[in-house]
Amino acid sequence: MFGGVKWSPQSWMSDTRSSIEKKCIGQVYMVGAHNAGTHGIQMFSPFGLDAPEKLRSLPPYVTFLLRFLTVGVSSRWGRCQNLSIRQLLDHGVRYLDLRMNISPDQENKIYTTHFHISVPLQEVLKDVKDFLTTPASANEFVILDFLHFYGFNESHTMKRFVEELQALEEFYIPTTVSLTTPLCNLWQSTRRIFLVVRPYVEYPYARLRSVALKSIWVNQMELNDLLDRLEELMTRDLEDVSIGGVPSKMYVTQAIGTPRNNDFAVAACCGACPGSHPDLYSAAKHKNPHLLKWFYDLNVNGVMRGERVTIRRGNNTHGNILLLDFVQEGTCTVKGVDKPMNAVALCVHLNTNQTARS
């Protein structure tokens, strides 16, 4: 309960309606799941088309032996979430980062991927539909961001992709509706999904990614390097006088680590090196609490690394979608609140209390 408002992860947007209804989607704090749909990756899952070609071209018996000897190191670093799409949504996640892959074994079968093939797109869409047709969650908004397509071609497989998307057509918010529209206006209809696609597709509900949101990959693994890069982005936008008013784009803060080759090598040794991370889960479990504390300090106190900054109204840099690996991991302490908060609770707190952007 924040500010006298009771909320649940399945319905936090509806529960905090009085606090967020005058905001547009780009002004609402929420948690995003990096590489959502990778929960299905297992030790011997087939390589996706986003995996290095040298690995994909190896004979099956060689890849089997390689995975066996390294205890499936590539799958342990390829899996960014261990919750299904429905579980992520029930947990309170409202932004799903998705990568698509054409299956090499079944013609036109579309799967999620991150170095390894995971679950069918149809399963992803079904989970989203089941969530939105649950009465408690019927007023929640969801952002589907399809940013990578491996093995697709415009004339055939992209057409199949659009056909599969039609399973949720009744929920898509038309592209004619501006992203600056207040949520109170959007709640007047039953459409709840912002559909974002990186390549242009002929579909009236698909927003071109470059127009709909800003999401900068910082390409760092070490925590301090990651925070430094995120703060560089904030500093740059603080100096941009053109930023103001109601943001016309959503903003994704990529609070995620990007593993290097040496991370894979060390992990293959099964954690033989002290302080090393055997998988992405371990790395996220270590980083997420620090990232949540940084996000809190910036948005509540206007502080970056101990120094106060002034955030112009309308600047949603690091003030909208917090993208995480293993979103359920990590908590931070919030002033005036007895119990530590996870990422979703922190975002609800920011939405219902005074912030440095208010």
From Swiss-Prot:
Enzyme Commission number(s) from the entry: 4.6.1.14
Function as written in the Swiss-Prot or TrEMBL entry: By hydrolysis of the attached glycolipid, releases soluble variant surface glycoprotein containing phosphoinositol from the cell wall of T.brucei after cell lysis. It also cleaves similar membrane anchors on some mammalian proteins. VSG lipase may play a role in processes such as parasite differentiation or antigenic variation.
Source organism of this protein record: Trypanosoma brucei brucei
Keyword Heme: no
Stretches of the chain forming a coiled coil according to its record: none
One biological process term in Gene Ontology: glycerophospholipid metabolic process
CDD domains (UniProt xref): PI-PLCXDc_like (cd08587)
Protein name: Variant-surface-glycoprotein phospholipase C
Principal EC category: lyase
